[in-house]
Amino acid sequence: PKKAIFDELDMGRDVILEIEMQGAMQIKEVYPQAVFIFVLPPSLQELKNRIIGRGTETEEQIEKRFNSAYDEIKLLGDYDYFIFNNIVEKSSEEILNILEVEKNKVSRYKKDILDMFEKEIENVKTIIK
């Protein structure tokens, strides 16, 4: 799927991946301009409730998942943004807002914008004369 992801990016499309911390850090090494958003639970209690609520894990697995999630939360500083996953619709909207802001980040397009105006400047100077 790596090729498919880069094909989408080459076409100018946003790609959203739901991945574990280890995968995110691997992507960050290969594609440093990627934007990383940490989706946090509203609270640790809610995190534990959600894990238990699935009803698919043993008590030992629940404890392991909870501890693993907590360890990942401690690495929040490796991400660019965070959101609290309270209400799905609100969380989705926050992610879309982050994507929109990133599209207007000067550091992403500084050279392209300057090149665009550089190409146009001579025509404008001619018109003014």
Predicted regions and their residues:
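Alpha-helical elements of Rossmann-like donor-binding domains used by nucleotide-donor carbohydrate transfer enzymes
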Residues: 4, 68, 94-98
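ATP-dependent NMP and nucleoside kinases share a basic, alpha-helical "lid"
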Residues: 1-55, 73-76
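Alpha-helical initiation/capping and key positions within long helical/coiled-coil segments
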Residues: 39, 61, 68, 87-90
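Conserved catalytic-core segment of NTP-binding enzymes
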Residues: 59-78
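NTP-dependent small-molecule kinase module
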Residues: 56, 74-129
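An amphipathic alpha-helix signature
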Residues: 44-48, 59, 89-92
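Residue-level signature of catalytic and energy-coupling elements of molecular machines
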Residues: 16, 69, 83
